[in-house]
Amino acid sequence: MAHKKGQGSTQNNRDSIGRRLGVKKFGGEFVRAGNIIIRQRGTATHPGNNVGIGRDHTIFALVDGFVKFERKDKDRKKVSVYPAA
């Protein structure tokens, strides 16, 4: 005889919902001031020209223009927005 009641399989059936992180506007895409370019945890990508960074490391455009992904140095990336000429 069992001393404990068997555990149901529903105990394991949980998962957290996705956080909707990632790139929202890609290279070459036109953005307006205030548009979110990247949602991220930590600074995987750093802010470049005409780009701001929020409390939660969200990168957003400060001016209207085109998104450009660049290298900051050997092992860091940055994203900039360049106004249309």
UniProtKB/Swiss-Prot annotation:
Please give the Gene Ontology molecular function terms for this protein. structural constituent of ribosome
Source organism superkingdom: Bacteria
**Which processes are annotated in GO (biological process)?**
translation
Kindly list the GO CC terms recorded for this protein.
cytosolic large ribosomal subunit
**InterPro entries, per database record:** Ribosomal_bL27, Ribosomal_bL27_CS
Which controlled-vocabulary keywords does the entry list?
Answer: Ribonucleoprotein, Ribosomal protein
Q: Which family does it belong to?
A: Belongs to the bacterial ribosomal protein bL27 family.
Q: Which NCBIfam families match?
A: L27 (TIGR00062)
Q: Which HAMAP family match?
A: Ribosomal_bL27 (MF_00539)
What is the recorded name of this protein? Answer: Large ribosomal subunit protein bL27
Species annotation: Campylobacter fetus subsp. fetus (strain 82-40)
